Amino acid sequence: YGVDVFVVDSLLKCGIADDDYSGQKAFVEALCDFKNQFGVTIFLVTHSRKGDNEFQRTGKMDVRGAGAISDLCDTLLTIFRNKKKEAEKSRAQAMHEDMPPDLKNAPDAILYCDKQRNGSWELQATLWWHDGANQYTQNELQEAEIYSQMRVVGQ
C-alpha cells in the first residue's frame, strides 16, 4: 500500500507484561526484522521509568522495560517537557504576574537524540508549544501550521 512509516503507540499496549523482558526483546526483534525486510521506518513509543521528579530529563538508560529496547533500536529519541515552566506559567497566570525571564525564554520542550546508529548526530532540538495548532515549532516566533480543523462536539 506504499506505507513506509509505522508508529506503535505504545509498547505498553502491545499485550506484553511489564516484567516480561524476554517478550519485550522478542517483540522489538520482530519489529527490527520487519523494518529490514520491507525497508520501512518504525517508531516505537515507550515510557520512561519513574525518576526522582518530573523536572529532570530522562535518557536511553531510563527506558522502561527490557534493556534490549534501547540496545536494538537504530535511533533513540527522548522528549523532555519543561514541566517547571508549565507550572510557573499556570501559577503566574493565576496570580496575574509575569513569569521569571529565565523560564519565560526557556523552551517548552527539548527533543534529544540519545542514540544514532546511522551517523554521529546525537544532539538536541529546542521546541516551543503552540496551543492553537496543538504542535511544537522550532522557535517561539515560528508560525505553526494548521493541518486540519477539528470540530469539538458540544461547542
Identify the residue ranges that each predicted region occupies.
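Conserved P-loop NTPase "ATPase switch" module shared by AAA+ and STAND
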Residues: 1-17
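Structural recognition of the conserved hydrophobic beta-strand(s) that form the central parallel beta-sheet
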Residues: 7-9, 40-47
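Short, ordered loop/turn segments at secondary-structure junctions
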Residues: 11, 47-48, 81-82
